[in-house]
């Protein structure tokens, strides 16, 4: 397990996890979403899942792939090689939402295992390394997400690295995947304008009042007109809370099944 001193060395100064778990467990969740984490190998996908589970209070310590002690990579072969081979499932509550995350293999040799998971997702989080940018396998993943019509959000990881350039990375995402890739910092007028340009309804709302309703954004995400982008560092637990809150606000959730009933 990772001790507190190691977390501090990585720049993580978190509030008490038991308190956070209590805060997110008090209320009964109003909705449930199933999220798949997909990425090219070494983008930091498993570290992101580790951060989500830690911040939501589901695990007491953040493991590391290079230490071989992550929660979801629990097969010996995975820990020895430092890669995910089998898809794994975990659940946590954040705000008013119960979230199931599926951590999928990033290595191209195990793409079939990853693709098998796509059909059950409400939304995908495509993890992109700020160091490597969009890779060939990232493009392959994007095409699969498009083929299965899966609403997609993007988390640009490793922003703590010196060579990471937010503006260049966002420009690359737009060039490769379209103008629907929008950074979800709505404090920025430029970001609000970029979001408004993705959909006529959002543009009308923005022009009439200067703001866009969250439900309107959620519909645009479901229709794959908008691909919300967040930037952070999974290793240092930076940007993860914003991503999780964004999932709660904008990720479409499956319609609940009607209660079964029959006359005998």
Language model: regions and residue ranges:
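Short, small-residue-biased leader/transition segments that mark boundaries at the very start
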Residues: 1-4
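Structural and coupling elements of P-loop NTPases
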Residues: 9-264
């Amino acid at each position: 397990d990772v001790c507190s001193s190691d977390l501090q060395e990585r720049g993580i100064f978190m509030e008490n996890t038991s308190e956070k778990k209590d805060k997110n467990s008090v209320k009964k969740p109003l909705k449930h979403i199933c999220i798949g984490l997909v990425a090219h190998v070494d983008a930091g996908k498993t570290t992101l899942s580790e951060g989500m589970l830690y911040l939501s209070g589901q695990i007491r310590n953040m493991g590391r792939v290079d230490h071989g002690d992550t929660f979801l990579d629990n097969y010996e072969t995975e820990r020895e090689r430092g890669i995910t081979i089998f898809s794994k499932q975990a659940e946590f509550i954040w705000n008013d939402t119960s979230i199931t995350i599926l951590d999928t293999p990033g290595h191209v040799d195990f793409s079939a295992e990853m693709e098998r998971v796509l059909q059950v997702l409400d939304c995908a989080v495509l993890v992109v390394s700020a160091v490597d940018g969009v890779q060939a396998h990232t493009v392959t993943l994007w095409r699969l997400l498009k083929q299965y019509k899966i609403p997609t959000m993007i988390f640009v990881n490793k922003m703590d690295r010196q060579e990471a350039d937010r503006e260049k990375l966002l420009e690359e995402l737009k060039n490769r995947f379209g103008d629907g890739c929008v950074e979800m910092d709505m404090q920025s007028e430029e970001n609000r304008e970029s979001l408004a340009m993705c959909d006529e309804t959002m543009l009308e709302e923005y022009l009439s009042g200067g703001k866009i309703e969250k439900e309107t954004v959620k519909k645009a995400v479901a229709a794959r007109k908008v691909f919300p982008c967040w930037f952070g560092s999974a290793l240092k637990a930076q940007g993860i809370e914003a991503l999780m809150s964004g999932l709660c606000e904008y990720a479409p959730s499956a319609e609940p099944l009607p209660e079964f009933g029959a006359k005998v």
